[in-house]
Amino acid sequence: MAGIRFFRMAEALARRGHEVDIVLNRHQEPQRLATRLREIPFKSVRWEHYHVVKTFFHRGFDSLVAEGGGDHPFIISKLGSVVGREQTEGVHFHGSVREQLYATQTAIAQRSRIVTVLTNRSAALWWKEHGVDSVLFQVPTGVDAEIPGAGANPYLRLGIEGPIALFAGNIYSRDKQAEVNLLWQDRLNRLGRSLKQRGISLVAMGAGETDQLDPAAVRHLGSFDASEYWDWQHHSQVGIVLAQGTAQDNESSKIYYYLRTGLPIVCEEPVPNKSLIEETGCGAIVPYDQIEAMSDAAAELVSARRDVDHIADYMIKKHSWDARAALYDPVLRGEGPMPAGLST
């Protein structure tokens, strides 16, 4: 769901009165998307016309440099992950992939006015690698304030009946994060078989390589547009969150999405933003790689009562994209530093 952030944050900043250009090579000419919001190709960009340039993850900064904008005086770099010079516990990028990310990160530290990260663990690693003089802020993932209501049950079209455990999100590719991809495919297979014994179907959706998934244990539906996604979640009974290992620096964006509809969650303990489940009382946190414990928790949550409206209101107020965009207002309006003290 990381790609959604790119557009949702831009939309939210525009709603807050900022003039925003999304720079992508999808169209030959600029496109007006909404009030104060355009999408333009790189050929139309004049970097010197912008007060601030905000990049999206390592690849966004690489694109900025490649397109001649790396010397802009006010770059805000958003990082989804922070890697170490050496392999670091909790960071699940390895070998040449990690080395390339670190090279980009070093350039970000040298050229960016502000860097934003997702979690406390990522902030600590950034300071360890790049020093405490970096202007660093924590801006977690957000979620849509407005979503479609429930439509027809899409699972029935596929002949899937009964309780659904949903795993929504990227399971990664072999060329970027092979270790997590293979680990998660194995664990989804094991979890699917265990859930099946309890009368629950495990359904997964999102990008990533799925060649090791057992279709008898896990039904993988591929990727969907954000507008299509919500019906699948509305008609699920529990959401699944896997950790990437016994330690994990990255948050899980799917937690924000599950909670937006009050979907109860079974989450593994190493996931940093598991505290949202505790705050909302909507789910269970289980030890890492305890498949039977996950299945037992899912079976209990399928029929658990919860205050869906209260949970949704909480997520909108505290964790919507507009709430996240508001954190940038002091900087973008020249009023001073961004608020500090965020925690996940």
Where are these regions (language model features)?
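Nucleotide-sugar-dependent
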Residues: 1-4, 175-182, 227-232, 239-257, ...
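N-terminal subdomain of nucleotide-sugar transferases
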Residues: 1-29, 48, 187-199
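A charged, aromatic-enriched C-terminal amphipathic alpha-helix characteristic of glycosyltransferases
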Residues: 289, 293, 302-339
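Active-site proximal beta-strand in glycosyltransferases
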Residues: 68-91
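Conserved catalytic-core segment of nucleotide-activated headgroup transferases in glycan assembly
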Residues: 5-8, 143-212, 223
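Conserved active-site histidine-acidic residue motif and adjacent donor-binding/catalytic loop
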Residues: 206-210, 218-234, 289
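Membrane-proximal helix-turn-helix segments that form the acceptor-binding/catalytic region
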Residues: 78, 82-84, 95-117
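Helix-loop-beta element that forms the nucleotide-linked donor phosphate-binding surface
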Residues: 110-111, 116, 123-143
